[in-house]
Amino acid sequence: MIVLNDRIIPWQPTVIAGPKQAMLVTPETATMMIKKARRPLMVVGPLAKRQEVLEHTVKIIRHFDLPVVATADTYRALSEAGIESEPHGIVEITNLLKDPSWEGIRGEGQHDLVIFIGCIYYIASQGLSSLKHFAPHIKTLTICKTFHSNADASFPNMDDDEWFRYLEKMYAE
């Protein structure tokens, strides 16, 4: 009998990553990846509007001074929390990130690490797959509560309590 680790299988079982699957990361590893990046970018999706998630997201953004892309309808929630962001659709930002000549959100050059939180799983999976195959100049990190096999690195599948502890460890140094 084969036993699968339910923490590292895609949250949506039909998402098949192929031979290259995400590395499972801890909050400490995620933090190290962000610190090591020269031009990281945070992409915040609509699932991050939930109050508890938004509070952690804002603290992470401030802690690392991350430029932010607000997808879907998160722009207002981030603005009300005092976070400056650029509104882009998830498909639009994915296409911009694939272009090595794009100068990035702050005009300082292409981003080398993109951190995703709160994006709807099925659309994030497609964007991550596109970046994996067509943007080798970018690393991707998902700090969602679901494992994203198409990212370069991802948190495991977990419940909210564990996820909030993971997120808190990222800014509570």
Swiss-Prot record:
GO terms for biological process: methanogenesis, from acetate. Pathway: One-carbon metabolism; methanogenesis from acetate. Pfam families: CO_dh. SUPFAM superfamilies: DHS-like NAD/FAD-binding domain. Belongs to the CdhB family. Heterotetramer of two alpha and two epsilon subunits. The ACDS complex is made up of alpha, epsilon, beta, gamma and delta subunits with a probable stoichiometry of (alpha(2)epsilon(2))(4)-beta(8)-(gamma(1)delta(1))(8). HAMAP family: CdhB. Part of a complex that catalyzes the reversible cleavage of acetyl-CoA, allowing growth on acetate as sole source of carbon and energy. The alpha-epsilon subcomponent functions as a carbon monoxide dehydrogenase. The precise role of the epsilon subunit is unclear; it may have a stabilizing role within the alpha(2)epsilon(2) component and/or be involved in electron transfer to FAD during a potential FAD-mediated CO oxidation. This is Acetyl-CoA decarbonylase/synthase complex subunit epsilon. It comes from Methanothermobacter thermautotrophicus (strain ATCC 29096 / DSM 1053 / JCM 10044 / NBRC 100330 / Delta H) (Methanobacterium thermoautotrophicum).
